[in-house]
């Protein structure tokens, strides 16, 4: 057990919403925080379900993830503030420092705010993942729940710009139809219940998405904006 209060922060959303970039940059600003990625809880390639229609692996299915281990790890982190499982991170997102320009003054101001958090009292753990709020058992473990969103066309364009993904055992490249038939369809199917009339391009249903805060991260959003917003949300939970 730890004497500190462990704050679990979830940054979730569809693939290519920008959640991992925001999580990585936040962890770079807040160096006392711990960052883990749900992607590190993918099963081995031969355990990932195969889609009956296309006869390919469905990496965007909830069944592709080891939720039992993920949930167990979150419980251990909540109790101890430390990671217990030896994780293999595949680093499938481009280095955000080479992709985005962040004003030095803004960066320093945000860093100073994070440095003001009393690390004798608080242990902040940031978790980035695409399947968090669809699973009630997982979702309820978090103190701060952030859903990063972007319009369908933006998500599709961003995903298409990626060369592929390192898995535990190989390298995956999306077939041409993969975003529509797997990525977005899985996001819609597993998150529709959080939205009014099940429309994942529409409004969150306050009755179903209780305590989930959203951030719209389209292509017109400067990276400093979500970083500042996430910082303020974390600071609210770490007041002396």
Swiss-Prot record:
Pathway: Cofactor biosynthesis; NAD(+) biosynthesis
GO CC term (a single one): fungal-type vacuole
Residues annotated for substrate binding in this entry: 39-42, 59-60, 159, 164-165
Active site (record annotation): 39 (proton acceptor)
InterPro entries in the cross-refs: P-loop_NTPase, PRK/URK
Coiled coil regions in record: none
EC nos: 2.7.1.22, 2.7.1.173
Binding site for Mg(2+): 20, 39
UniProt-listed GO biological process terms: NAD biosynthetic process; nicotinamide riboside metabolic process
Alphabetized UniProt keyword annotations: ATP-binding, Kinase, Magnesium, Metal-binding, Nucleotide-binding, Pyridine nucleotide biosynthesis, Transferase
Residues holding ATP: 13-21, 158, 162-164, 208-210
Single Gene Ontology MF annotation: ribosylnicotinate kinase activity
Catalytic activity: beta-nicotinamide D-riboside + ATP = beta-nicotinamide D-ribonucleotide + ADP + H(+); beta-D-ribosylnicotinate + ATP = nicotinate beta-D-ribonucleotide + ADP + H(+)
Physiological role: Catalyzes the phosphorylation of nicotinamide riboside (NR) and nicotinic acid riboside (NaR) to form nicotinamide mononucleotide (NMN) and nicotinic acid mononucleotide (NaMN).
Family assignment from sequence similarity: Belongs to the uridine kinase family. NRK subfamily.
Name the UniProt record assigns to this protein: Nicotinamide riboside kinase
Lineage: Eukaryota, Fungi, Dikarya, Ascomycota, Saccharomycotina
Gene for this chain: NRK1
């Amino acid at each position: 057990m730890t004497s500190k209060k462990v704050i679990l922060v979830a940054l979730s959303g569809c693939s290519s919403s920008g959640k991992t970039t925001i999580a990585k940059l936040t962890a770079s600003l807040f160096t006392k925080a711990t960052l883990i990625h749900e992607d590190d809880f993918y099963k081995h390639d031969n355990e990932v379900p195969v889609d009956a229609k296309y006869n390919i692996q469905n990496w965007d299915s909830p069944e592709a993830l080891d939720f039992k281990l993920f949930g167990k790890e979150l419980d251990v982190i909540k109790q101890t503030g430390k990671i217990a499982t030896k994780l293999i991170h595949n680093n499938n997102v481009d280095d955000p420092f080479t992709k985005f320009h962040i004003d030095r003054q803004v960066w320093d101001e945000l860093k100073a705010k994070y440095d003001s958090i009393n690390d004798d009292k608080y242990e902040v753990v940031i978790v980035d993942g695409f399947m968090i709020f669809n699973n009630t058992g997982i979702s309820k473990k978090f103190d701060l729940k952030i859903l990063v969103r972007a319009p369908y066309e933006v998500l599709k364009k961003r995903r298409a710009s990626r060369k592929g993904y390192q898995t535990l055992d190989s390298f995956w490249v999306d077939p041409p139809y993969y975003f529509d038939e797997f990525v977005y369809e899985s996001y819609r199917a597993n998150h529709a219940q959080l939205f009014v009339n099940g429309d994942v391009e529409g409004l969150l249903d306050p009755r179903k998405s209780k305590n989930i805060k959203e951030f719209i991260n389209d292509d017109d959003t400067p990276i400093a904006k979500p970083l500042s917003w996430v910082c303020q949300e974390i600071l609210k939970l770490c007041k002396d």
